[in-house]
A protein has these predicted regions:
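Flexible glycan-contacting loops in extracellular carbohydrate-active proteins
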Residues: 206-238
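Extracellular beta-strand elements of beta-rich domains used
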Residues: 44, 240-244
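Secretory/extracellular carbohydrate-interaction modules
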Residues: 47, 80-157
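Short, composition-biased motifs enriched in small/polar/acidic residues
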Residues: 251-327
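Short, aromatic/His-centered strand-loop micro-motif at the edge of beta-sheets
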Residues: 159-181
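Extracellular glycan-recognition surfaces and repeat-rich motifs
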Residues: 48-89
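Bacterial N-terminal signal peptides
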Residues: 17-28
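Short tryptophan-centered beta-strand motifs in secreted/extracellular beta-sheet-rich domains
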Residues: 117-119, 178-188, 193-195
Length: 327
Protein backbone atom coordinates (compact mmCIF):
# COMPACT_ATOMS: atom_id res chain seq x y z
CA UNK A 1 0.00 0.00 0.00
CA UNK A 2 0.91 3.66 -0.27
CA UNK A 3 1.31 5.85 2.80
CA UNK A 4 -0.98 8.88 3.07
CA UNK A 5 0.24 12.08 1.49
CA UNK A 6 -0.16 15.52 3.03
CA UNK A 7 -3.63 16.89 2.31
CA UNK A 8 -4.26 20.55 1.79
CA UNK A 9 -6.61 20.74 4.53
CA UNK A 10 -9.61 -11.22 29.93
CA UNK A 11 -11.69 -13.27 27.43
CA UNK A 12 -10.40 -16.01 25.12
CA UNK A 13 -8.53 -14.31 22.33
CA UNK A 14 -9.69 -15.28 18.87
CA UNK A 15 -7.87 -13.64 15.98
CA UNK A 16 -10.01 -12.94 12.94
CA UNK A 17 -8.34 -14.53 9.93
CA UNK A 18 -7.46 -12.26 7.02
CA UNK A 19 -8.13 -15.11 4.60
CA UNK A 20 -11.85 -14.43 5.05
CA UNK A 21 -11.36 -11.58 2.61
CA UNK A 22 -11.55 -14.00 -0.31
CA UNK A 23 -15.19 -14.66 0.40
CA UNK A 24 -16.11 -11.23 1.73
CA UNK A 25 -14.92 -9.16 -1.22
CA UNK A 26 -17.47 -10.74 -3.48
CA UNK A 27 -20.22 -9.70 -1.07
CA UNK A 28 -19.29 -6.05 -0.79
CA UNK A 29 -21.86 -4.89 -3.34
CA UNK A 30 -24.40 -7.68 -2.93
CA UNK A 31 -28.04 -6.78 -2.41
CA UNK A 32 -29.21 -7.60 1.10
CA UNK A 33 -32.00 -10.11 1.58
CA UNK A 34 -35.50 -8.73 1.41
CA UNK A 35 -36.27 -5.26 0.12
CA UNK A 36 -33.08 -3.53 1.20
CA UNK A 37 -32.50 -0.11 -0.33
CA UNK A 38 -29.10 1.55 -0.62
CA UNK A 39 -29.20 5.05 0.90
CA UNK A 40 -25.49 5.77 0.60
CA UNK A 41 -22.47 4.17 -1.06
CA UNK A 42 -18.93 5.38 -1.63
CA UNK A 43 -15.92 3.74 -3.24
CA UNK A 44 -13.99 7.04 -2.77
CA UNK A 45 -13.12 7.16 -6.48
CA UNK A 46 -12.36 10.19 -8.69
CA UNK A 47 -15.53 9.35 -10.62
CA UNK A 48 -17.45 10.22 -7.44
CA UNK A 49 -15.58 13.56 -7.32
CA UNK A 50 -13.08 12.51 -4.65
CA UNK A 51 -9.73 14.30 -4.94
CA UNK A 52 -6.68 12.77 -3.23
CA UNK A 53 -5.10 16.22 -2.92
CA UNK A 54 -7.56 17.18 -0.20
CA UNK A 55 -8.80 15.89 3.16
CA UNK A 56 -11.86 13.65 3.16
CA UNK A 57 -13.67 16.27 5.24
CA UNK A 58 -15.77 18.49 2.91
CA UNK A 59 -15.83 15.95 0.07
CA UNK A 60 -19.13 14.28 -0.91
CA UNK A 61 -20.84 15.49 2.27
CA UNK A 62 -18.26 14.07 4.70
CA UNK A 63 -17.91 16.04 7.92
CA UNK A 64 -15.42 15.81 10.75
CA UNK A 65 -14.11 17.02 14.08
CA UNK A 66 -10.44 17.36 14.94
CA UNK A 67 -7.42 18.20 12.81
CA UNK A 68 -5.75 14.78 12.68
CA UNK A 69 -4.90 13.17 9.36
CA UNK A 70 -7.67 12.13 6.99
CA UNK A 71 -8.00 11.91 3.25
CA UNK A 72 -7.53 9.48 0.39
CA UNK A 73 -4.88 6.92 -0.56
CA UNK A 74 -4.52 4.75 -3.65
CA UNK A 75 -4.18 0.97 -4.01
CA UNK A 76 -3.93 0.07 -0.33
CA UNK A 77 -6.58 -2.48 -1.33
CA UNK A 78 -5.40 -4.06 -4.56
CA UNK A 79 -7.69 -3.48 -7.51
CA UNK A 80 -10.04 -1.15 -5.63
CA UNK A 81 -8.59 2.22 -6.65
CA UNK A 82 -8.78 4.90 -3.96
CA UNK A 83 -9.60 4.40 -0.28
CA UNK A 84 -10.40 6.77 2.55
CA UNK A 85 -8.16 6.93 5.60
CA UNK A 86 -8.00 8.42 9.09
CA UNK A 87 -4.81 8.75 11.16
CA UNK A 88 -1.10 8.98 10.29
CA UNK A 89 -0.69 12.77 10.45
CA UNK A 90 -0.73 14.26 13.99
CA UNK A 91 -3.36 16.90 14.79
CA UNK A 92 -2.54 20.51 14.07
CA UNK A 93 -4.10 21.80 17.30
CA UNK A 94 -2.83 21.17 20.85
CA UNK A 95 -5.22 19.63 23.33
CA UNK A 96 -7.12 17.46 20.87
CA UNK A 97 -7.87 13.90 21.95
CA UNK A 98 -9.44 12.50 18.77
CA UNK A 99 -10.37 13.05 15.15
CA UNK A 100 -13.70 11.76 13.87
CA UNK A 101 -15.40 11.54 10.48
CA UNK A 102 -19.04 11.04 9.60
CA UNK A 103 -21.31 11.34 6.60
CA UNK A 104 -24.92 12.34 7.40
CA UNK A 105 -27.57 10.29 5.62
CA UNK A 106 -31.01 11.61 4.74
CA UNK A 107 -34.08 10.12 3.12
CA UNK A 108 -34.65 7.16 5.45
CA UNK A 109 -38.39 6.54 5.77
CA UNK A 110 -39.82 6.12 9.30
CA UNK A 111 -40.75 2.48 8.63
CA UNK A 112 -37.22 1.67 7.40
CA UNK A 113 -35.93 0.85 10.86
CA UNK A 114 -33.39 -1.84 9.97
CA UNK A 115 -30.04 -0.37 8.86
CA UNK A 116 -27.11 -2.44 7.57
CA UNK A 117 -23.61 -1.00 7.22
CA UNK A 118 -20.71 -2.70 5.46
CA UNK A 119 -17.17 -1.48 4.91
CA UNK A 120 -13.76 -2.90 4.01
CA UNK A 121 -11.11 -1.82 6.53
CA UNK A 122 -7.47 -2.29 7.46
CA UNK A 123 -5.40 -0.87 10.31
CA UNK A 124 -1.77 -0.03 9.51
CA UNK A 125 0.73 -0.34 12.38
CA UNK A 126 2.72 2.60 13.78
CA UNK A 127 6.42 2.94 13.09
CA UNK A 128 7.02 5.54 15.84
CA UNK A 129 6.28 3.26 18.82
CA UNK A 130 2.95 4.93 19.68
CA UNK A 131 -0.27 3.00 19.13
CA UNK A 132 -3.79 4.40 19.25
CA UNK A 133 -7.43 3.31 19.05
CA UNK A 134 -9.57 3.27 15.92
CA UNK A 135 -13.32 3.09 16.33
CA UNK A 136 -16.60 3.02 14.44
CA UNK A 137 -19.34 4.96 16.20
CA UNK A 138 -23.11 4.95 15.63
CA UNK A 139 -25.09 8.12 16.36
CA UNK A 140 -28.81 8.80 16.26
CA UNK A 141 -30.39 11.79 14.52
CA UNK A 142 -30.01 13.85 17.72
CA UNK A 143 -26.21 13.42 17.49
CA UNK A 144 -26.27 11.12 20.56
CA UNK A 145 -23.75 8.30 20.44
CA UNK A 146 -25.44 4.93 20.72
CA UNK A 147 -22.76 2.25 20.26
CA UNK A 148 -19.03 2.01 19.50
CA UNK A 149 -16.77 -0.73 18.16
CA UNK A 150 -13.16 -0.19 19.23
CA UNK A 151 -10.00 -1.57 17.62
CA UNK A 152 -7.28 -1.16 20.25
CA UNK A 153 -4.01 -1.01 18.31
CA UNK A 154 -1.97 -1.37 21.53
CA UNK A 155 -3.42 -4.75 22.52
CA UNK A 156 -5.05 -5.68 19.16
CA UNK A 157 -8.24 -6.41 21.11
CA UNK A 158 -11.65 -5.56 19.67
CA UNK A 159 -13.91 -3.93 22.28
CA UNK A 160 -17.36 -2.37 22.29
CA UNK A 161 -19.34 0.15 24.29
CA UNK A 162 -23.04 0.87 24.61
CA UNK A 163 -24.28 4.35 25.47
CA UNK A 164 -23.25 3.82 29.09
CA UNK A 165 -19.64 4.48 27.92
CA UNK A 166 -18.26 1.29 29.48
CA UNK A 167 -15.90 -0.55 27.12
CA UNK A 168 -16.10 -4.34 27.21
CA UNK A 169 -14.13 -7.00 25.30
CA UNK A 170 -15.70 -8.89 22.40
CA UNK A 171 -13.21 -11.72 22.94
CA UNK A 172 -11.73 -11.21 19.47
CA UNK A 173 -8.45 -9.71 18.27
CA UNK A 174 -7.32 -8.35 14.91
CA UNK A 175 -4.13 -8.21 12.87
CA UNK A 176 -2.40 -5.19 11.37
CA UNK A 177 -2.27 -4.93 7.58
CA UNK A 178 -5.14 -7.46 7.33
CA UNK A 179 -8.16 -6.56 5.21
CA UNK A 180 -11.56 -7.18 6.81
CA UNK A 181 -15.17 -6.68 5.83
CA UNK A 182 -16.99 -5.22 8.81
CA UNK A 183 -20.77 -5.44 9.02
CA UNK A 184 -23.18 -3.72 11.43
CA UNK A 185 -26.86 -4.72 11.46
CA UNK A 186 -28.95 -2.28 13.50
CA UNK A 187 -32.65 -2.88 14.19
CA UNK A 188 -34.01 0.32 15.66
CA UNK A 189 -37.53 -1.11 16.09
CA UNK A 190 -36.15 -3.97 18.18
CA UNK A 191 -33.48 -1.81 19.92
CA UNK A 192 -30.62 -4.16 19.04
CA UNK A 193 -27.46 -4.38 16.93
CA UNK A 194 -25.07 -7.08 15.81
CA UNK A 195 -21.55 -6.95 14.36
CA UNK A 196 -19.78 -9.50 12.22
CA UNK A 197 -16.63 -9.92 10.18
CA UNK A 198 -17.61 -12.10 7.23
CA UNK A 199 -19.09 -15.25 8.79
CA UNK A 200 -17.79 -14.55 12.32
CA UNK A 201 -20.28 -12.85 14.66
CA UNK A 202 -18.47 -10.62 17.17
CA UNK A 203 -21.60 -9.31 18.91
CA UNK A 204 -25.17 -10.54 18.60
CA UNK A 205 -28.34 -8.62 19.53
CA UNK A 206 -26.77 -6.11 21.91
CA UNK A 207 -28.88 -3.14 23.02
CA UNK A 208 -28.71 0.04 20.91
CA UNK A 209 -29.66 2.35 23.77
CA UNK A 210 -29.69 1.71 27.51
CA UNK A 211 -30.74 5.28 28.36
CA UNK A 212 -33.94 5.74 26.39
CA UNK A 213 -32.23 7.74 23.62
CA UNK A 214 -34.07 8.28 20.33
CA UNK A 215 -33.95 5.06 18.29
CA UNK A 216 -33.24 6.64 14.93
CA UNK A 217 -30.23 6.37 12.62
CA UNK A 218 -28.12 9.50 12.14
CA UNK A 219 -24.67 8.45 10.98
CA UNK A 220 -21.89 5.89 11.40
CA UNK A 221 -18.25 6.85 10.98
CA UNK A 222 -14.62 6.25 11.95
CA UNK A 223 -12.74 7.79 14.88
CA UNK A 224 -9.05 8.02 15.64
CA UNK A 225 -8.53 8.29 19.42
CA UNK A 226 -5.00 9.31 20.48
CA UNK A 227 -3.76 7.16 23.36
CA UNK A 228 -1.23 9.88 24.24
CA UNK A 229 -2.59 13.13 22.80
CA UNK A 230 0.80 14.84 22.98
CA UNK A 231 2.48 12.06 20.95
CA UNK A 232 -0.02 10.18 18.75
CA UNK A 233 1.09 7.21 16.69
CA UNK A 234 1.50 7.31 12.93
CA UNK A 235 -0.82 4.32 12.65
CA UNK A 236 -3.89 4.77 10.47
CA UNK A 237 -7.07 3.05 9.34
CA UNK A 238 -7.92 2.62 5.66
CA UNK A 239 -11.51 1.98 4.56
CA UNK A 240 -13.41 1.44 1.31
CA UNK A 241 -16.70 0.23 -0.16
CA UNK A 242 -18.66 2.14 2.50
CA UNK A 243 -22.32 1.17 2.13
CA UNK A 244 -25.56 1.75 4.04
CA UNK A 245 -28.80 -0.05 3.23
CA UNK A 246 -32.20 0.22 4.91
CA UNK A 247 -35.28 -1.99 5.06
CA UNK A 248 -38.37 -2.47 7.17
CA UNK A 249 -37.83 -4.43 10.36
CA UNK A 250 -39.61 -7.63 11.27
CA UNK A 251 -40.27 -6.01 14.63
CA UNK A 252 -43.12 -3.52 15.08
CA UNK A 253 -41.94 -0.08 16.11
CA UNK A 254 -42.22 0.17 19.89
CA UNK A 255 -43.13 3.29 21.80
CA UNK A 256 -40.19 4.57 23.89
CA UNK A 257 -40.83 4.74 27.64
CA UNK A 258 -42.02 7.96 29.28
CA UNK A 259 -41.97 9.09 32.90
CA UNK A 260 -44.17 11.78 34.43
CA UNK A 261 -44.04 13.16 37.98
CA UNK A 262 -47.46 13.01 39.66
CA UNK A 263 -46.66 14.11 43.22
CA UNK A 264 -46.48 12.49 46.65
CA UNK A 265 -48.55 9.83 48.37
CA UNK A 266 -50.02 10.47 51.81
CA UNK A 267 -47.26 8.36 53.39
CA UNK A 268 -44.46 10.33 51.65
CA UNK A 269 -43.60 8.20 48.64
CA UNK A 270 -42.73 9.84 45.32
CA UNK A 271 -45.23 8.97 42.57
CA UNK A 272 -44.49 8.63 38.86
CA UNK A 273 -46.45 7.47 35.84
CA UNK A 274 -44.62 5.26 33.33
CA UNK A 275 -45.90 5.01 29.77
CA UNK A 276 -44.71 3.14 26.69
CA UNK A 277 -45.42 0.01 24.68
CA UNK A 278 -48.16 -1.89 26.52
CA UNK A 279 -46.45 -5.29 26.45
CA UNK A 280 -42.81 -4.25 26.84
CA UNK A 281 -40.97 -4.52 30.16
CA UNK A 282 -39.30 -1.25 31.18
CA UNK A 283 -36.99 -0.68 34.13
CA UNK A 284 -37.27 2.57 36.08
CA UNK A 285 -33.94 3.57 37.59
CA UNK A 286 -33.15 6.11 40.28
CA UNK A 287 -30.05 8.19 41.08
CA UNK A 288 -29.08 11.00 43.42
CA UNK A 289 -26.03 12.15 41.42
CA UNK A 290 -26.77 11.27 37.73
CA UNK A 291 -23.77 8.94 37.82
CA UNK A 292 -24.84 5.81 39.69
CA UNK A 293 -28.23 4.40 38.70
CA UNK A 294 -30.12 1.80 40.76
CA UNK A 295 -33.14 -0.20 39.50
CA UNK A 296 -36.35 0.85 41.22
CA UNK A 297 -38.96 -1.30 39.48
CA UNK A 298 -39.45 -3.30 36.28
CA UNK A 299 -42.97 -3.42 34.85
CA UNK A 300 -45.17 -3.20 31.74
CA UNK A 301 -47.15 0.04 31.23
CA UNK A 302 -50.28 -1.83 30.17
CA UNK A 303 -52.89 -0.18 27.96
CA UNK A 304 -52.65 3.17 29.75
CA UNK A 305 -49.77 3.65 32.17
CA UNK A 306 -48.15 2.11 35.24
CA UNK A 307 -47.85 3.85 38.60
CA UNK A 308 -44.34 3.71 40.08
CA UNK A 309 -43.57 4.79 43.65
CA UNK A 310 -40.28 5.50 45.41
CA UNK A 311 -40.54 5.12 49.21
CA UNK A 312 -36.96 6.31 49.79
CA UNK A 313 -37.36 9.66 48.02
CA UNK A 314 -37.95 11.69 51.24
CA UNK A 315 -34.50 10.65 52.49
CA UNK A 316 -32.72 12.53 49.68
CA UNK A 317 -32.32 16.21 48.87
CA UNK A 318 -32.54 15.45 45.15
CA UNK A 319 -33.62 12.39 43.19
CA UNK A 320 -33.47 11.62 39.45
CA UNK A 321 -35.43 9.02 37.50
CA UNK A 322 -35.19 7.44 34.07
CA UNK A 323 -36.85 4.54 32.24
CA UNK A 324 -35.31 2.13 29.75
CA UNK A 325 -36.19 -1.13 28.06
CA UNK A 326 -35.52 -3.97 30.49
CA UNK A 327 -32.59 -6.31 29.83
Amino acid sequence: GVEPQTGMRGVTRRTIAACWLAVSLGLANATALGQARTVYYSGFEPGQDYDAEYTLIDQDGWQGKGTGGNGLVEDNFEGLGQQGYIGFWPPEEDGETFTSLWRPVEGIDPEETKVTFTVLMMIIASTNGQRDDFRWGVYNDNAQRLVTLDFDNETRNINYALDDNIFLPTGYTFENEALYELKFVMDFAANNWSVSVSDEVLLNSKTLTTTGASLTFGDLGPLWVYRKPETPGNNYMVFDEYKLTVETSDEPVKTPPTLAWTGWTDDGRAMLQMGGDATTDYTVEVSDDLKTWTPLETAKPGDTWKEITDPEAPDYEQRFYRARTAD
